[in-house]
Structures are given as structure tokens and as C-alpha cells.
Amino acid sequence: MASIAVCPGSFDPVTYGHLDIIRRGANVFEQVYVCVLNNSSKQPLFTVEERCELLREVTKDIPNVTVETSQGLLIDYAKKKRAKAIIRGLRAVSDFEYEMQGTSVNRVLDESIETFFMMTNNQYSFLSSSIVKEVAKYNGPVSEFVPPEVEQALMQKFKG
């Protein structure tokens, strides 16, 4: 049986930190579904479709990664894909506290799907999509934080 994992997130926008987790997950699992979700508590800069397109562009060199979106519960999406794992990236202890809540709920909904936490590489431990958007909004350089395709998309969003 193939080892399948889901790597969920809002990815608004995708950063090098996200890509680090996706690449490392793809080295562990035979198939990784990157699932773009809408976080109802956030106002997204990019539409779900734009985020999916950017993710497809920056992961096109990773053959076992597929980018999709889902409107429902993450656990239902994971079951539909026959995933046995959910991959979550952690930057700091504060991330763990938040992720633990979601993991606990997912365990109640389906205890057969495990959550794997991956620590981001140190160079990305401070990085968040919110910080990237804030820097880009004021025309600051973001090339150290995001791939060129994402940098261009950010420039387009904030230029007008």
C-alpha cells in the first residue's frame, strides 16, 4: 500500500518555509497532497485558485506532490485521498500549542490518521505568510522569503 500524506495550509502566500516542509514530506511519503484550505478567521490576499496555481508552479519539480483544494473538514479530505498521515510544519512552541488542538480534534474524528510534525529548518523559523505580506505591502524585498513566482504575484497585488 502506498504511503499517502496530506500537507494542508492556507499558503497565503506559499513561502520557502512551506516549500521546505512539502519537499521533506515528499521525501518521506510516496504521495503528498498539498491541500489549500480557506481559514475563515483570516482575510486572504490571494484567492484559493491563485494559491493553488502558485503552489503548482513552485512544486512542479516534485513528481509525487499534487496540489488541490478542499472546502470541508481536513480529515474528510484525508480519508477521501486514503491518506494515513497529515504533515504539519512547526516553527516554534507557540505553533505546537495551536496544532495540538487541531490534531486532537482530528484524532477524535478518525484515529487511524496520524499527524506528523516537522520542525522547519532554522533559516525559516521566523517566517510566516503574514510577515511576507507585510513586507511586500510596503515594497520591501521578499526574495529571501518566497520563490520568484510568488514575489511577482505579490508585486502585482500591491502595485495598484
Curated annotation (Swiss-Prot):
Q: Mind telling me which Gene3D superfamilies this protein's record contains?
A: HUPs
Transferase is among the record's keywords: yes
Q: Which cofactor does it need?
A: Mg(2+)
Q: Sorted alphabetically, which keywords does the UniProt record give?
A: ATP-binding, Coenzyme A biosynthesis, Cytoplasm, Magnesium, Nucleotide-binding, Nucleotidyltransferase, Transferase
Q: Which reaction does it catalyse?
A: (R)-4'-phosphopantetheine + ATP + H(+) = 3'-dephospho-CoA + diphosphate
* GO MF term set: ATP binding; pantetheine-phosphate adenylyltransferase activity
Stated role = Reversibly transfers an adenylyl group from ATP to 4'-phosphopantetheine, yielding dephospho-CoA (dPCoA) and pyrophosphate.
Q: How does it assemble?
A: Homohexamer.
Q: What is this protein called?
A: Phosphopantetheine adenylyltransferase
Q: Which lineage do the record's taxonomy fields give for this organism? A: Bacteria, Bacillati, Bacillota, Bacilli, Bacillales
Gene from which this protein is expressed: coaD
